[in-house]
Amino acid sequence: MATARTARSRRKVRKVRDKWKEKVWYEIYATPEFGGVFIGYTPANDPSLVLGRVAETSLRDLTGDPTKHMHRVYFKIFGVTGNKAIAQYYGHDTTREFMKSQIRRRRSRIDAILDVKTQDGHKIRTKAMVLTAYRANTKQKSDIRKKMEEIIKAMAKEKTFPQYVQAMLFGEMAEKIKNECKKIFPIKNVIIYKSEVLSLAKKEENEGFVKEAEEETAEAQE
């Protein structure tokens, strides 16, 4: 009886191993706004199974900038060519440890959470936080929040999807918010701490974006 079970167990192990042998390891690359950099690998026995998968990496690994270690970036695979998968920005967040380290007593935290549409029709939820140098009153906090929302909406309206992503992650948006809000009250820090792609542009526009991304990513890898 024990021998029979052992034989069945061996057959199961062989079957599992055979399934893995059938899988192909696809290389995941970011879209051109991130330089078409390599993100990682994902296994599948059919390229259609790769589409829609979400890969995670740190902004530090993407940019080579050690000061960006606190941000995690998510990419969703939307195209496969050969054994290469192209992944589009899908969102980002910030580590809880970093967020806690920035919040201090006797400071005010002002949050702005907006769903905006970029110039080319992509909808993104953006979450930003302003930390004041010391405690602000109710009106000052209200004025700061209004200014934050005004800046985020304006940037979305004037920028394409890749440009808006860069503004969020590489400091342009935070710097703009800080420079404008410090006219209202002294500001300690501004963090664009989270974002999420809610929907893409209509199909024909998105297909053009996919084709362009595939071509530019291929050029970046040459």
Curated annotation (Swiss-Prot):
Q: Give the GO terms filed under biological process for this record.
A: translation
S-S bonds: none
Q: GO CC terms for this protein?
A: cytosol; ribonucleoprotein complex; ribosome
Q: Which family does it belong to?
A: Belongs to the eukaryotic ribosomal protein eS1 family.
Q: Which UniProt keywords apply?
A: Ribonucleoprotein, Ribosomal protein
List the NCBIfam families hit by this protein, alphabetically: PRK04057.1
In its UniProt record, a GO molecular function of this protein is: structural constituent of ribosome
The family database entries (Pfam families) matched by this protein are listed as: Ribosomal_S3Ae
UniProt-recorded name of the protein? Small ribosomal subunit protein eS1
PANTHER family assigned: 40S RIBOSOMAL PROTEIN S3A
